[in-house]
Amino acid sequence: MNKVPLLEMRNITKSFGKFQALKGVDLTVFSGEIHALMGENGAGKSTLMKILAGAYTTTSGEILIEGRPWSIKGPKDALNAGISLIYQEMQLAPNLTVAENIFLGSELSRGGLVQRKEMVMQTQAVIDRLGAQFKASDLVMGLTIAEQQQVEIARALHRNSRILVMDEPTAALSTRETHRLFELILRLRDEGMAIIYISHRMAEVYELSDRVSVLRDGQYVGSLMRANLNANELVRMMVGRPLSDLFNKERDIPLGHLRLNVHHLTDGAKVQAVSLQVRSGEIVGLAGLVGAGRSELAQLIFGVRKATGGTIEIDGVPLVIHSPREAIRHGIGFLTENRKEQGLFLELAAQDNITMATLERDACYGLLDRKKARAISDDAINRLNIRVPHAQVRAGGLSGGNQQKLLISRWVAISPRILILDEPTRGVDVGAKSEIYRIMSQMAREGVAILMISSELPEVVGMSDRVYVMHEGRIAGELHHPDITQENIMTLATGVTEDHKKEVYHD
């Protein structure tokens, strides 16, 4: 690294009215460095980067580029400083070509005529440098999300940007697309670019970053070099407490009667003769690899998928559940895996999302009782600590953690007997995870039977009283404490037999 930082942000303060979003934040970034920026939602990461990109102006503080003070009052000042920011939501015109997007606002012209051929040639040269598969003449609307991201990066390279800010760039990418993006980021770093990488995903930070800086409550907490990265320390810096305190599972909750009894449940495709039980007050983990049939099993119980065999009993009563409406009537709640596509109504208010499952129960002669709906939503917002200014705020404008808690509150509102949670903390930061774990533990104490599907093994180990592991549509095994370990779960999830365990783990 060079001794003189490429970028210094010193004592940056930003206020919105009486609210102070940033309180004297410092950030130093060098050329040829991938610098991860971490923190809970609301910690100030996006605000700090919007100041750097010229979307916001500072209340106080200064920005230096290569040791020289640089005034950034708007996006043009940031571009002149060699700074580009790639937002989570792509800033592209879908009905224009790649070349037209690259040159948007700075079109090449001669004699009053736009030089389209030259623009295409220059754009294609940048695309080839990236190793992308699309062409400069392709319409952006026909590209994948990963390819659109490459267009954003190509635009930054065309502008000769030296500092590239990426805000949660893998949120909508597949595993393969993420791997390709990482290869590109590492190549850009090796070419001397400074990359500020905003993410809440520790695995990505461990794989990519040369250094990590953490913000908490609008303040700079500290930085760690790659050699010193430690999950416990990162969590402590982000939330003010160690990783061991993250899981809020109470082990002294007395278990009640058998609440959910699934026997030989089958759909003829993804789920084969699955049997499991969950007691009142119990959190049961359901682990397994992608494609093992976990989500499909949950959909069978909730009536989304049709069972071809097997039985479901709730509190000892055999039931045939044909639809989600019937499941809700029987006191079953289901947090879906993808909150944006299968759970939330993003354009509706928080209150409407919360009360969606109680409409049939609380309607009077087919009319919504608005006073009761408001009371239900206000109670849920307070109980789950959902950070919204009011109940009428649009759900799509909330952070990932608050969206997830909003969806959980929908099922809390029906006072469920059984709650199925499919990837309950996917896509949320550490602080929101801790809140969700607290909610789960509280509901278990109130007697709710919880079936938790999760691909995060520390979560399964930390929150489960028992664990079922699925492999190829069947239950491969059941684990009790102290045998609930990541190694034992993976052994069952991958179909490794007792005869091969020693070979796999100790070869």
Swiss-Prot record:
The enzyme's E.C. designation: 7.5.2.7
Q: Where in the cell is it found?
A: Cell inner membrane
Superkingdom of origin = Bacteria
Q: Which InterPro entries match?
A: AAA+_ATPase, ABC_carbohydrate_import_ATPase, ABC_transporter-like_ATP-bd, ABC_transporter-like_CS, P-loop_NTPase
- Output the Gene Ontology terms for molecular function: ABC-type D-ribose transporter activity; ATP binding; ATP hydrolysis activity
GO cellular component terms, A-Z: plasma membrane
| Boundaries of every ABC transporter domain copy | 7-242, 253-497
Q: Which Pfam families match?
A: ABC_tran (PF00005)
The record ties this protein, via Gene3D superfamilies, to: P-loop containing nucleotide triphosphate hydrolases (3.40.50.300)
Which SUPFAM superfamilies does this one have? P-loop containing nucleoside triphosphate hydrolases
Keywords of the record, alphabetical order, are: ATP-binding, Cell inner membrane, Cell membrane, Membrane, Nucleotide-binding, Repeat, Sugar transport, Translocase, Transport
In the bilayer, the protein is annotated as: Peripheral membrane protein
Catalytic activity field: D-ribose(out) + ATP + H2O = D-ribose(in) + ADP + phosphate + H(+)
- State whether it acts alone or in a complex, and with which partners, per the record: The complex is composed of an ATP-binding protein (RbsA), two transmembrane proteins (RbsC) and a solute-binding protein (RbsB).
Similarity remark: Belongs to the ABC transporter superfamily. Ribose importer (TC 3.A.1.2.1) family.
Instruction: State what this protein does.
Output: Part of the ABC transporter complex RbsABC involved in ribose import. Responsible for energy coupling to the transport system.
What is this protein's record name?
Ribose import ATP-binding protein RbsA
Q: What is the scientific name of the source organism?
A: Yersinia pseudotuberculosis serotype I (strain IP32953)
Classification lineage: Bacteria, Pseudomonadati, Pseudomonadota, Gammaproteobacteria, Enterobacterales
